[in-house]
C-alpha cells in the first residue's frame, strides 16, 4: 500500500511540475523571429575562413544556437528570405513588411525580432518604420561574423534583441 502511495505521490509531483512549467511558459511574452539571411545566418567552410555564404542557416538553426532564449520569451520563427542583404529588393521588403504587420496584428504576439544582414539593415528598418503602425516593438539584429565563425556574435545579438523586444520600455518605439 505504501509503495502505491509513493508512486501516486511521485506522479502527482511530476504532473504538478509539468503544470508549473506550462504556466511559466504562458506567462512569458511571445516573440516572432523573422529571418531574412545575412551574415548572422552565414556559413564558411572552416571557422577560420574569411569567405562565407550569407543566409546558409535557417531561423530554427539560428534560434537553437542561443542558450536560455526560452527563459526570455516563447519564441517562434519564420523564414522570410535566405539572402545576403546586398540582395534585398522591393519584393523581399514588401513580403517582410506584410508579414511584420500581420504578426503585429496577432493579439498573442508581443513583438517581432528580425535577423538581417548589415549591408541594408538600416534601409529595411527605415522602411518598416514607414509602413508599420503598431506600438509593439520591432527589433532588428545582424552580425559581423558568420554563424560558423570562431567567435560568432549572432547568438548574443539575437539574445539581446529578444531582451529588448520583451522589455516593456520598448513599446511605442518601432
Where are these regions (language model features)?
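Gram-negative bacterial Sec-dependent N-terminal signal peptides
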Residues: 1-25
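Active-site histidine-anchored catalytic micro-motif
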Residues: 19, 25-174
Amino acid at each position: 500500500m505504501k509503495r502505491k502511495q509513493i508512486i501516486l505521490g511521485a506522479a502527482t509531483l511530476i504532473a504538478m511540475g509539468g503544470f508549473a512549467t506550462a504556466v511559466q511558459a504562458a506567462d512569458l511574452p511571445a516573440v516572432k523571429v523573422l529571418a531574412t539571411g545575412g551574415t548572422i545566418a552565414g556559413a564558411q567552410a572552416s571557422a577560420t575562413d574569411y569567405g562565407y555564404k550569407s543566409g546558409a542557416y535557417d531561423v530554427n538553426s539560428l534560434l537553437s544556437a542561443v542558450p536560455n532564449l526560452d527563459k526570455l520569451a516563447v519564441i517562434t520563427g519564420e523564414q522570410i528570405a535566405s539572402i545576403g542583404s546586398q540582395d534585398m529588393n522591393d519584393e523581399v521588403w514588401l513580403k517582410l513588411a506584410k508579414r511584420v504587420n500581420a504578426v503585429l496584428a496577432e493579439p498573442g504576439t508581443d513583438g517581432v525580432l528580425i535577423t538581417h544582414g548589415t549591408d541594408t539593415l538600416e534601409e529595411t528598418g527605415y522602411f518598416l518604420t514607414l509602413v508599420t503602425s503598431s506600438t509593439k516593438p520591432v527589433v532588428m539584429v545582424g552580425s559581423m561574423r558568420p554563424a560558423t565563425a570562431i567567435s560568432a556574435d549572432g547568438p548574443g545579438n539575437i539574445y539581446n534583441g529578444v531582451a529588448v523586444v520583451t522589455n516593456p520600455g520598448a513599446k511605442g518605439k518601432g
